[in-house]
UniProtKB/Swiss-Prot annotation:
Protein name: Phosphoglucosamine mutase
Keywords of this entry: Isomerase, Magnesium, Metal-binding, Phosphoprotein
Phosphoserine PTM sites in chain numbering: S108
MF annotations from Gene Ontology: magnesium ion binding; phosphoglucosamine mutase activity; phosphomannomutase activity
Cofactor(s) for this UniProt protein: Mg(2+)
Species, as recorded: Frankia alni (strain DSM 45986 / CECT 9034 / ACN14a)
Lineage top rank: taxon: Bacteria
Binding site for Mg(2+): S108, D246, D248, D250
Function: Catalyzes the conversion of glucosamine-6-phosphate to glucosamine-1-phosphate.
Length: 455
């Protein structure tokens, strides 16, 4: 049976393969498995678990939120709804309110018809695989006895938790942004109101783009996966920096004054060097995923910074950071984790820390981005194949080995099944774009031939 949870929660087309019934069942199972330890959590010795619930702006978020809230309350959990909010705001609210766990409804950068469910454990941490598996197993079983009378959960709106998150973000900014002109692309998502508000409170001159909160247009030609309009706006508005978020604002990418993209690897490099300069980079180590560009590794090695590598997914980055006591980690895609201030990738926090570095150094972002030189990287998404056999195909293994031999020390190959979409990702880095592109296309053809979709 296909696993319900992917690398970042549950995702699917809302009302097709992510239904209200599933959302209610998942919420009930989560209370049963995560709720018991929280019944006595917090200074008030609560009689029932407390669960924080937030969502992005997608139209389907309303009925899925209603289903989740119903499942939680019917299973005996109190619910604190914070409404439309970034994913990291839910994680922060769980920790700040000493909640038992939290639920975020979002499909991140996916198109509008999709939606998803992310669950945060006590303290605001994403669930480990074994807990997600336990929730899936419980969902497959008949429902147990439900509370009655005064034992059912209560539901209340708690917008103040979002205000506490905004205050927390501003407290993590080391300097004011008074002289910076910033364009922020909110992707019509969860940060549409909050990101411009926080940046203005920090002193920046803000031009908000795709920030109406129109969930029907979430991620449509905007945000971290569609940077063209942001690049144009930065140049047209003579801005210093452009900031892009995705639908749930757990990611941040940037654009410099010339309209050039600054990706997650470059942001990490800038922040790692800044922390190291201040003696605040624990063990002089940064944590990244296997997708990180070789140029990042080269730059960190030259700076005397150790790089720890994990599988794709910011929760794996966080797990490695917590295990090693590290404070900075992230992904090329723009998930950046400042573990002293957050428990998950936080796009707004990342934007503030990046802009703070621009402000405190007085250097343009384009100059700071020279902290690393990216090797040409080509990513090909191969659809319509059996992604479950990526690691077991002899034909594919042979093709990868041959490509790696050709590239030598000047490049690398990575093939992996997506954890959030039905496809296989082929990534190649090389010393020239032409070599990377040719190698990636040849490997993609082998993937199509070796991994035909099951009939």
């Amino acid at each position: 049976m296909t696993r319900l949870f992917g690398t970042d929660g549950v995702r699917g087309v809302a009302n097709v393969n992510l239904t209200a019934e599933q959302a209610l069942s998942l919420a009930s199972a989560a209370v049963e498995l995560l709720g018991a330890p929280g019944r006595s959590a917090g200074p008030a010795q609560r009689p029932r678990p407390l669960v924080v619930v937030g969502r992005d702006t997608r139209p389907s978020g309303e009925f899925l939120e209603a289903a989740v809230v119903a499942g939680l309350a019917a299973s005996g959990a109190d619910v604190a709804r914070i409404g439309v909010a970034p994913t990291p705001a839910v994680a922060h609210a769980v920790a700040a309110s000493d909640a038992t766990f939290g639920v975020m409804l979002s499909a991140s950068h996916n198109p509008m018809p999709d939606n998803g469910i992310k669950v945060f454990a006590a303290g605001g941490l994403k669930l480990p695989d074994e807990v997600e598996d336990a929730i899936e197993r419980r969902m497959a079983q008949p429902p147990g006895p439900r509370p009655v009378g005064a034992d059912v959960g209560r539901i209340r709106d708690e917008p103040g938790l979002l205000d506490r998150y905004a205050d927390h973000l501003l407290a993590a900014l080391p300097v004011r942004l008074d002289n910076l002109r910033v364009v922020v692309d909110c992707a019509q998502g969860a940060a549409s109101a909050l990101a411009p508000r926080v940046l203005r409170a920090a002193g920046a001159d803000v031009i908000a783009l795709h920030a109406d909160g129109d969930g029907a247009a979430i991620n449509d030609g905007s945000g971290v996966t569609h940077l063209d309009s942001l690049r144009a706006a930065v140049v047209d508005q003579a801005a210093d920096v452009g900031i892009a978020h995705d639908g749930d604002a757990d990611r941040c990418l940037a654009v410099d004054a010339a309209g050039e993209i600054v990706d997650g690897d470059q942001i990490l490099a800038i922040c790692a060097l800044a922390l190291a300069e201040r003696g605040e980079l624990a063990d002089d180590t940064v944590v990244v995923t296997v997708m990180s560009n070789l140029g990042f590794h080269h730059a960190m090695r030259e700076a005397g910074i150790t790089v720890v590598t994990t599988p794709v997914g910011d929760r794996y980055v966080v797990e490695a950071m917590r295990a090693g006591g590290y404070v900075l980690g992230g992904e090329q895609s723009g998930h950046v984790v400042f573990l002293d201030h957050a428990t998950t990738g936080d796009g707004l926090l990342t934007a503030l820390r990046l802009l703070g570095r621009v402000a405190e150094t007085g250097q343009p972002l384009g100059e700071l981005a020279k902290a690393m030189t990216r090797l040409p990287q080509v990513l090909v998404n191969v659809r319509g194949v059996d992604r479950t056999r990526v690691d077991t195909s002899p034909q594919l293994r042979a093709a990868v080995a041959a490509a790696e031999a050709e590239l030598g020390d000047g490049g690398r190959v990575l093939l992996r099944p997506s954890g959030t979409e039905p496809l296989v990702r082929v990534m190649v880095e090389a010393e020239t774009d032409a070599v990377a592109r040719d190698t990636a296309q040849r490997l993609a053809a082998v993937v199509r031939a070796a991994l035909p979709a099951p009939r």
